[in-house]
From Swiss-Prot:
Organism: Staphylococcus aureus (strain NCTC 8325 / PS 47)
Family to which this protein belongs: Belongs to the staphylococcal tandem lipoprotein family.
Keyword list, A-Z: Cell membrane, Lipoprotein, Membrane, Palmitate, Signal
Protein known as: Uncharacterized lipoprotein SAOUHSC_00405
GO terms under cellular component: plasma membrane
Higher taxonomy: Bacteria, Bacillati, Bacillota, Bacilli, Bacillales
Subcellular location: Cell membrane
Lipidation residue positions, type S-diacylglycerol cysteine: C23
Length: 270
């Protein structure tokens, strides 16, 4: 009996040592992570924050997003699997004072595994009194293809909508970590963070954009990575990519891309 007690005491002490050692290792790992975050520059933090979504690019089949989960926080209701919002828009000025803006928004609901949205066509005027002309054409995604739900008599526009591809479907940011010497802007009060890079026309993403869109300027674009909200992640804020080819008046040319994961709206999912 005395022998059994000694064995039990030995095992208790051993487990206690392992537990304390484990806690020590966990604390060491936490300290290492905290130290890494402290030593990372804001530029590195911005790139790491974007990498959480950009590492998924190219998303050739958008329906794969039904099986992917983004950043979750207390804004999500119990049982809500979340919704991905994806947007690609292209704006170009062909004459001073007017900006032609077209693109698509799609909401991919992971609860229902349904994706609906719209294609938008808009003219943005310097004279804001004229800015009431946006047209929206309802669409849905089926078998990774855009299906037009509204009647569109313009055959050219109809074809453009049905063949539309989001930037995230062909963009590749595998070398994002190699982007260097960005122009960094931060506002901790908002909070917001921005990294801007001068790209080269030989960049594969830039070349692809020139193939798809009527980009007439030969200027190499600036790439802007913009975060609104907590740099570590937030379902309230958002992240946006922007390629600006020209800022000249009457020649403004911009591609913007947005992929965000957030709570599903208007549903009882509990």
């Amino acid at each position: 009996m005395e022998y059994i007690k000694k064995i039990a005491l030995y095992m208790s002490v051993l487990l206690l040592i392992i537990f304390i050692g484990g806690c020590g290792n966990m604390k060491d790992e936490q300290k290492k992570e905290e130290q890494t975050n402290k030593t990372d520059s804001k530029e590195e933090q911005i790139k790491k924050s974007f990498a959480k979504t950009l590492d998924m690019y190219p998303i050739k089949n958008l329906e794969d997003l039904y099986d992917k989960e983004g950043y979750r926080d207390g804004e999500f209701k119990k049982g809500d699997k979340g919704t991905w919002t994806i947007l690609t828009g292209f704006s170009k000025s062909n004459k001073p004072g007017v900006l032609d803006d077209e693109g698509m928004v799609l909401y991919l609901n992971r609860n229902t595994k349904k994706a609906t949205g719209y294609y938008f066509v808009n003219k943005v005027y310097d004279d804001i009194s004229k800015n009431h002309n946006e047209k929206k054409y309802r669409v849905e995604l089926k078998n990774n293809k855009i299906v037009l739900l509204d009647n569109v008599e313009d055959k050219k526009l109809k074809q453009k909508i049905e063949n539309f591809k989001f930037f995230s479907q062909y963009a590749d940011f595998k070398d994002l970590k190699n982007y260097q010497d960005g122009n960094i802007t931060t506002n901790e009060n908002v909070p917001s963070y921005e990294a801007q890079y001068k790209m080269n026309n030989s960049d594969k993403n830039v070349k692809k954009l020139r193939e798809i869109y009527p980009i007439t300027t030969n200027n190499s674009p600036n790439l802007k990575l913009y975060i609104d909200g907590d740099i570590k992640g937030s379902s309230v804020g958002y992240k946006k990519i922007e390629y600006k080819f020209s800022k000249d008046k009457g020649q403004e040319t911009t591609l913007r891309d947005y992929l965000n994961f957030g709570p599903s709206e208007g549903e009882n999912v509990e």
